Amino acid sequence: MLFIVRRPKPIREAPCKYLIAGGLMFIAYEASISLSIGLATTNAQSVEVSLVNYLWPTLLVLMTAAVSRKHGAVVKAIPGAIVATIGVAMAVGGESLSVQEAVSNIDSNPLPFALALAGAFIWAIYATFTPSLSEGYDGTTIFFCCVAVVLWTIHFASGDGLPATAPGIGGYAALLACAISISGGYACWGYGMLHGNMETLAIGSYATPLFSTASSTLLLGVALGMPFWIGVALVVAGSLINLWFARRS
């Protein structure tokens, strides 16, 4: 699908250091996130692992501030980052989020949380530093092909084969819809990284977990509770704080 949405330039035009560094980070991120969700043993752990993964917008905001070379940029980014991160936790975790239960789950099953945290750092580093290595080349499509190979290899190496029964028309339709949304999202993100303002893009990335949670609840037919809307308000407030400080800098 990405070859349709974002056909890459000939690979010979890509800087070697970008292909190696960017490709390894992209694959590592996708693999770590996929494995972290797969290794979660309960619904509560899945939510908590997602929350750890959604630290990447905060890390991205702080990293882009750090490399901007603006005086006091990191310190000025912290207040908005804290407010927005609390908002993300409320929006994604909702009323079911329990700090005590989360600590217990981390203690009993630390690997998925470690993978999710590693993924958050990897993606923030990838988004911050690969644009300067790319020289305008967008390797998202190539990287995703490599991700597919790695994930299928992990799948078969774990002993799982192909599904016993083929999905119906509804399953294929859902698969196509997911492919379109994911490929479109990554294509837009890759274009924004190369041609947009990274500080603004980083701040805007706080909307990612909100849209993800909202779409999930709508697909499952679950009503969005008050914690979600409070979280949205906090994310908006934190983003505006970051934008205000960024423009003043």
At which residue positions do the language-model features occur?
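Transmembrane alpha-helical segments that form core, pore/gating elements
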Residues: 1-4, 57-62, 99-161, 188
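C-terminal transmembrane-helix exit sites in multi-pass transporters
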Residues: 2-9, 56-79, 210-230
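Specific transmembrane alpha-helical segments of multi-pass solute transporters/efflux pumps
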Residues: 7-46, 90, 178-196
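Juxtamembrane helix-entry segments on the extracytoplasmic side of multipass membrane proteins
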Residues: 11-16, 93-120, 157-177, 223-233
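Cytoplasmic-side transmembrane-helix entry/capping segments in multi-pass membrane proteins
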Residues: 14-23, 72-85, 135-145, 200-203
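Hydrophobic/small/kink-forming positions within alpha-helical transmembrane segments
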Residues: 23-27, 31, 57-62, 89, ...
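Specific alpha-helical transmembrane segments that line the substrate/conduction pathway
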Residues: 35-71, 198-217
